[in-house]
């Protein structure tokens, strides 16, 4: 299947039966809702830039699984050059949208789950890695968006998952069947969850044997039976309900979004399960994901920073203050911090190394 365009991506969302709630009510046409649509436009930009020859070198890659050309957001990094291109791609998209484009978490999850399941299978004789490779091949071939989900509501931070008064404050396995598992709980603050075709779930902390039911990783579609999303609020988000030409809207075309993703006894077939009780490997998956995601901030936040710095400089010029020393000092400091963050992203990429599975870790 060829790479999708931004418009094709938006149309693909309309075919989903995702259950989205906002302000206490279900949103039927969430794709065109004025509060949600700017975040969809941000994701669409990841598709449109992949179609542009000027940016194809950053936005696309050759799949190590199939040999086909794929969107880099579905790619497994196989060199330090891949890691560097990832950071540069993220800076580009931050510059183009001035917002969160929501696909970084899924990309980072792909690489963390790929290497962790390989070592898990090596130690336990399971077939999770095979399951994951088949899943990722499907995602690459159909050019889909995947929400990487790690953060649980947690409850009392001083207690382990199994010791919580409410056992569902961490996502867990509540039933094991011959053909799969049933999960219950939630993932909180999930970037781009509503705008995703699938969700890739990971544990949120290192765990011990008593927490085995919480050591779970799997994939499920956004409109799976029993899956509900409560849309997260953004600062000043209701301004988008006003005149779209209003100067008070701010970034009227693009935006970010998060959601509370609730799993109300969702069935996950065995083929989409990548960890189910192997608590010894929960910490490895969390640590590897965290490394990739810190690297991501060296790109995406820097791109948005470029926009913010440019806007601040323009505001100073409009007000005739561009030559004021204290204004220049602030702009210089902002630029210094922004470029330092970018340097950190590039440096940790250049120092990357291969995992046992073959993909590269920072």
Kindly give the residue locations of the regions a language model identified.
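N-terminal-proximal low-complexity accessory segments that begin disordered
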Residues: 1-49
């Amino acid at each position: 299947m060829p790479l999708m365009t931004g418009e094709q991506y938006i149309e693909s969302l309309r075919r989903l039966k995702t259950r989205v709630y906002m302000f206490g009510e279900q949103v039927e046409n969430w794709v065109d809702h004025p509060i949600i649509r700017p975040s969809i436009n941000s994701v669409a930009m990841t598709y449109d830039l992949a179609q542009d020859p000027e940016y194809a070198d950053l936005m696309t890659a050759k799949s190590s699984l199939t040999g086909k050309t794929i969107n880099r957001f579905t790619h497994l990094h196989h060199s330090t050059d891949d890691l560097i291109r990832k950071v540069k791609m993220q800076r580009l998209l931050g510059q183009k949208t001035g917002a969160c484009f929501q696909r970084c978490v899924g990309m980072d999850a792909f690489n963390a789950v790929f290497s962790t399941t390989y070592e898990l299978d090596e130690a336990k004789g399971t077939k999770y890695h095979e399951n994951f490779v088949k899943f990722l091949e499907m995602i690459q071939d159909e050019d889909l968006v995947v929400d990487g989900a790690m953060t649980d509501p947690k409850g009392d931070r001083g207690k382990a998952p199994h010791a919580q008064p409410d056992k569902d404050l961490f996502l867990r396995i509540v039933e094991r069947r011959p053909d799969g598992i049933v999960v219950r709980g939630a993932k909180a603050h999930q970037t781009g969850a509503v705008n995703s075709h699938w969700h890739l779930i990971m544990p949120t902390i290192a765990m011990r044997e008593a927490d085995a039911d919480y050591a779970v990783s799997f994939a499920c579609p956004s409109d799976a039976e029993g899956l509900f999303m409560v849309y997260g609020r953004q600062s000043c988000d209701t301004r988008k309900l006003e005149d779209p030409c209003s100067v008070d809207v701010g970034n009227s075309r693009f935006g970010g979004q998060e959601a509370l993703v609730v799993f109300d006894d969702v069935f996950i077939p065995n083929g989409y399960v990548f960890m189910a009780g192997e608590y010894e490997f929960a910490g490895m998956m969390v640590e590897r994901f965290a490394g990739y995601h810190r690297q991501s901030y060296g790109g995406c936040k820097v791109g948005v920073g470029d926009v913010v710095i440019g806007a601040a400089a323009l505001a100073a010029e409009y007000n005739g203050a561009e030559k004021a020393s204290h204004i220049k000092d602030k702009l210089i400091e902002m630029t210094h911090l922004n470029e330092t963050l970018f340097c950190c992203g590039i440096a940790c990429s250049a120092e990357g190394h291969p995992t046992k599975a073959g993909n590269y870790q920072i």
